[in-house]
Amino acid sequence: MASIICGSLAFDTIMNFEGKFSQQIMPDQLHILNVSFLVPSLRRDFGGCAGNIAYSLKLLGGTPLPMATIGQDGGVYLERLAKLGISAEFVRTIDDAYTAQAMIITDVDNNQINGFHPGAMEQAWQTRVSARSDIRLGIIAPDGRDAMVQHAEQFAAADIPFVFDPGQQLPRFDGAELRKFVELSTWVTVNDYEGKMLSDRTGWDNAEISRHVKGLIVTIGAEGSEVWVDGVKTHVPAVTAAAVVDPTGCGDAYRGALLYGLENGWSLERCAALGNQVGSVKIAQRGPQNYQFSLA
């Protein structure tokens, strides 16, 4: 069984600030905000939600099929996917754009300030989900706005169950659009902040959202996960990390585990437990695709 992973392929530039943002930003001066952070360390990684989720799913033994767009500078990413044994058959190159780029600054409390250039990602609507016998599952992760809308409709038309994972793109949709996403999807996953925004915009609380799908999974950081099914919440405890080094990509690592469990017919609670475990391993390593994990 293969899973289509709709989302971005991106290059991440990750910088670490050896202080606290809260000590540099004055709340009463936000109207004239002008700050600069000295970042002694800088690293460039392969990233993007589709790439990160595919990496996690592949580590676990699944079959990811990322559906994404890259730019004229994306050849090295194709080489990366080939080296990992991940198919790029649904990856399209946009010659007049750059691959999406994320600029991330993390402070000592693991707070992050991000800048994101979408580049070729905004052309992801040029890719298309179609029914195929080996494709049994999908996920819509943060991607170009039009692509997310079209892919949700295409998954539904192809009768492929999928996870709706709006992430940082959630603010780009209004309440009616988000309600439609929920109604088309089979599962929804968000972090606690995104969950509050999703509830605010749809007018549905977590219990109500869970009644429209087979399950709602809410990650709550160091506290683990909440699984909502038919209005009933189950808490899935966190796994203590060996070290807290870099949160970048933890949510995507979790979602790869979620897909693996769904591919194998697991309960959502078991999926969430694996997600917590993989996330705890990822956070102990720098970068979204530099950790190792095995179910053996």
Regions found by a protein language model. Give the residues of each.
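Glycine-rich phosphate/adenosyl-contacting loop at the front of the ribokinase-like
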Residues: 1-65, 76
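Active-site metal-binding loops of divalent metal-dependent hydrolases
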Residues: 9, 143, 253
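Conserved phosphate-binding/catalytic loop of the ribokinase/pfkB sugar-kinase fold
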Residues: 89-94, 102-146
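A glycine-rich beta-to-alpha transition motif near the start of alpha/beta enzyme domains, typified by
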Residues: 63-90
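Conserved phosphate-binding/catalytic region of the ribokinase-like
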Residues: 203-296
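Conserved phosphate/ATP/ADP-binding segment of small-molecule kinases
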Residues: 150, 156-163, 167-237
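Hydrophobic anchor at the start of a short beta-strand
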Residues: 3, 63-65, 88, 162, ...
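Gly/Ala-rich phosphate-binding loop of Rossmann-like dinucleotide-binding domains
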Residues: 58, 156, 263
